[in-house]
Amino acid sequence: MPPSGLRLLPLLLPLLWLLVLTPGRPAAGLSTCKTIDMELVKRKRIEAIRGQILSKLRLASPPSQGEVPPGPLPEAVLALYNSTRDRVAGESAEPEPEPEADYYAKEVTRVLMVETHNEIYDKFKQSTHSIYMFFNTSELREAVPEPVLLSRAELRLLRLKLKVEQHVELYQKYSNNSWRYLSNRLLAPSDSPEWLSFDVTGVVRQWLSRGGEIEGFRLSAHCSCDSRDNTLQVDINGFTTGRRGDLATIHGMNRPFLLLMATPLERAQHLQSSRHRRALDTNYCFSSTEKNCCVRQLYIDFRKDLGWKWIHEPKGYHANFCLGPCPYIWSLDTQYSKVLALYNQHNPGASAAPCCVPQALEPLPIVYYVGRKPKVEQLSNMIVRSCKCS
């Protein structure tokens, strides 16, 4: 008579076979997305970009070079392109919002503009065309110790009575006392005061990251080519002289200020590890060792890769693409797996697993000619900045 263990073996074999077929732990690298040859992916990405650019410009085919004027681009066109490129670069330099930071309540702080009798204003020529607003960055850092904690920053101005409609523009003080355009506003006539608000989150983050002591804005009347009068007609509270006593105190309290919304420092410790991991992810994505879903570098040279000479600036750009498997949990004891099985039964050629797709995209400014006329365009969603599994 065989031992009891051998007698039970026929009964145990089906159970052992079931355990082999049914993993009890996540299949970390499992993905039903088909793997593709890297060179094939790059070629397909290049062809997709060719069609994408023509489609965004509403062109059926690349424009003819025609009689393009020789020499460099006109100065005005180049200045417009450079300002557009700088604005895009400034926006892309802003850190991505922290999902965990968004959970916490935000502390709101008001930082008043440096008063107009400060010597910093003496460095800028008084003009009927503009007003200047400067802020002490030490006060900003006291309110927001780290740039990543800043959720939103608004420049608030109290506009007094305005008799005529006026188009105004806001600029940021840049390096070498130059000014970078930020935004504009069309102000309608009004008999009552009104608060104006400009979103300057990215600018304040830059200030917090740099070591400067005083930073500022300029509000100017729109310089119209067909108008000789470019006087700033709007009266902003805090710049009118001749007030005394309590009225002057109230007037000074309502001078321009920055409204800051940030995660308090005592709640920030929890975010340190997640920020560190995300910073490492960026490095991993551009290394050859990372196999999972990540941003892969791809530089497009317009002449070499597309055979185009009609785009004058830039000569090329980093389009990038997303590639890599997306891990997910596969277990037969979940309802999700039953749905997947049913999905695969009815769609045998489809992928039920998450796939690597773009998450954040950036625009691309270009200069090109239509006949003899140069044009500056901003093409949306042309640069892959980050990827996700979806």
From Swiss-Prot:
> Which pathological condition is tied to this protein?
Camurati-Engelmann disease: An autosomal dominant disorder characterized by hyperostosis and sclerosis of the diaphyses of long bones. The disease typically presents in early childhood with pain, muscular weakness and waddling gait, and in some cases other features such as exophthalmos, facial paralysis, hearing difficulties and loss of vision. Inflammatory bowel disease, immunodeficiency, and encephalopathy: An autosomal recessive disorder characterized by severe infantile inflammatory bowel disease manifesting as bloody diarrhea and failure to thrive, global developmental delay, epilepsy, brain atrophy and encephalopathy. Affected individuals suffer from recurrent infections associated with impaired T-cell response to stimulation and decreased T-cell subsets, including regulatory and helper T cells.
Q: Which gene encodes it?
A: TGFB1
Which stretches of sequence are listed as region Straightjacket domain? Answer: 30-74
Q: Does the keyword tRNA-binding apply?
A: no
Which key words are in the record?
Answer: Cleavage on pair of basic residues, Disease variant, Disulfide bond, Extracellular matrix, Glycoprotein, Growth factor, Mitogen, Secreted, Signal
GO terms assigned for molecular function: cytokine activity; deubiquitinase activator activity; enzyme binding; growth factor activity; identical protein binding; protein serine/threonine kinase activator activity; protein-containing complex binding; type I transforming growth factor beta receptor binding
Name the family: Belongs to the TGF-beta family.
Q: What is the effect of changing residue 75 to A?
A: Does not affect integrin-binding or activation of TGF-beta-1
**What is the recorded phenotype of mutating residue 193 to A/R?**
Does not affect integrin-binding or activation of TGF-beta-1
List the protein's name: Transforming growth factor beta-1 proprotein
Q: In which tissues is it expressed?
A: Highly expressed in bone. Abundantly expressed in articular cartilage and chondrocytes and is increased in osteoarthritis (OA). Colocalizes with ASPN in chondrocytes within OA lesions of articular cartilage.
> Which cysteines are disulphide-bonded?
285-294, 293-356, 322-387, 326-389
Q: An example Gene Ontology cellular component term from the record?
A: cell surface
Q: Which GO terms describe its biological process?
A: adaptive immune response based on somatic recombination of immune receptors built from immunoglobulin superfamily domains; aortic valve morphogenesis; ATP biosynthetic process; branch elongation involved in mammary gland duct branching; bronchiole development; canonical Wnt signaling pathway; cell morphogenesis; cell-cell junction organization
Give the residue ranges of motif Cell attachment site.
Answer: 244-246
Function of the molecule: Transforming growth factor beta-1 proprotein: Precursor of the Latency-associated peptide (LAP) and Transforming growth factor beta-1 (TGF-beta-1) chains, which constitute the regulatory and active subunit of TGF-beta-1, respectively.
Q: How does it assemble?
A: Homodimer; disulfide-linked. Interacts with the serine proteases, HTRA1 and HTRA3: the interaction with either inhibits TGFB1-mediated signaling and the HTRA protease activity is required for this inhibition. May interact with THSD4; this interaction may lead to sequestration by FBN1 microfibril assembly and attenuation of TGFB signaling. Interacts with CD109, DPT and ASPN. Interacts with EFEMP2. Interacts with TSKU; the interaction contributes to regulation of the hair cycle.
Please tell me what else the database record remarks about this protein: TGF-beta-1 is inactivated by fresolimumab (also named GC1008), a monoclonal-neutralizing antibody.
Q: Where is this region: Arm domain?
A: 75-271
List the Gene3D superfamilies: 2.60.120.970, Cystine-knot cytokines
Region of interest (Bowtie tail), residue spans: 226-252
Q: Which InterPro entries does this one have?
A: Cystine-knot_cytokine (IPR029034), TGF-b_C (IPR001839), TGF-b_propeptide (IPR001111), TGF-beta (IPR016319), TGF-beta-rel (IPR015615), TGFb1 (IPR003939), TGFb_CS (IPR017948)
Posttranslational modification: Transforming growth factor beta-1 proprotein: The precursor proprotein is cleaved in the Golgi apparatus by FURIN to form Transforming growth factor beta-1 (TGF-beta-1) and Latency-associated peptide (LAP) chains, which remain non-covalently linked, rendering TGF-beta-1 inactive.
Q: Which domain of life is it from?
A: Eukaryota
What result follows from mutating residue 222 to D? In CAEND; sporadic case; higher levels of active TGF-beta-1 in the culture medium
Signal peptide range in chain numbering? 1-29
